[in-house]
Swiss-Prot record:
This is SsrA-binding protein. GO terms for molecular function: RNA binding. It comes from Prochlorococcus marinus (strain MIT 9211). GO terms for biological process: trans-translation. InterPro entries: SmpB, SsrA-bd_prot, SsrA-bd_prot_CS. Required for rescue of stalled ribosomes mediated by trans-translation. Binds to transfer-messenger RNA (tmRNA), required for stable association of tmRNA with ribosomes. tmRNA and SmpB together mimic tRNA shape, replacing the anticodon stem-loop with SmpB. tmRNA is encoded by the ssrA gene; the 2 termini fold to resemble tRNA(Ala) and it encodes a 'tag peptide', a short internal open reading frame. During trans-translation Ala-aminoacylated tmRNA acts like a tRNA, entering the A-site of stalled ribosomes, displacing the stalled mRNA.
Length: 166
């Protein structure tokens, strides 16, 4: 009998298996994110190839809960150029998100009671699976955004002043 050799996974392979594919940076500016949830996403083959190539836009995306299912709307996944028109997918189709029933019920209660919204924050690989992180967010008003910008600017000024006097 021959023994099987244990194959060691290198750091570069591990990093490739857990890389971020798309991010919605604008969401963190427009919404105050209260809670996040990692879910799976139901995709077709050409969508998987396109997401892995980085051809995804999360900026206008949002999530809804309809008939007990979590759905992703308005996320643009570009069609593949070399797949032809017959096998390609609709770029803006509604996609089902995969989460446990308890998690969906918890999100549904939060969205209905507090007037919060569900926003896609990022898409990443977890092993060979494509996962999406959605956030429960409360919309920011203009004055909240200005306060945040002032606070960030003050921190930058303080760091630059400390760097000058070192």
């Amino acid at each position: 009998m021959t023994k099987k050799k244990n194959k060691k996974v290198t750091k570069s392979e591990r990093g490739e298996a857990n890389r971020r594919l798309a991010e919605n940076r604008l969401a963190r500016h427009q919404y105050e994110i209260l809670e996040t949830l990692e879910t799976g996403i139901e995709l077709v083959g050409t969508e998987v190839k396109s997401i892995r190539a980085g051809n995804t836009n999360l900026r206008d995306g949002f999530c809804l809960i309809r008939e007990g299912e979590l759905q992703l709307h308005n996320v643009h996944i570009s069609p593949l150029n070399n797949a032809g028109n017959f096998f390609n997918h609709d770029p803006l189709r509604t996609r089902k998100l995969l989460a446990h029933r308890k998690e969906i019920n918890k999100l549904e209660i939060q969205v209905a009671r507090k007037g919060l919204t569900l926003i896609p924050l990022s898409i990443h690989l977890k092993g060979s699976w494509i996962k999406i992180i959605i956030g429960v967010g409360k919309g920011r008003k203009l004055h909240d955004k200005r306060e945040d910008d002032k606070r960030k600017q003050a921190n930058r000024d303080m760091k630059s002043a400390l760097a000058r006097y070192r």
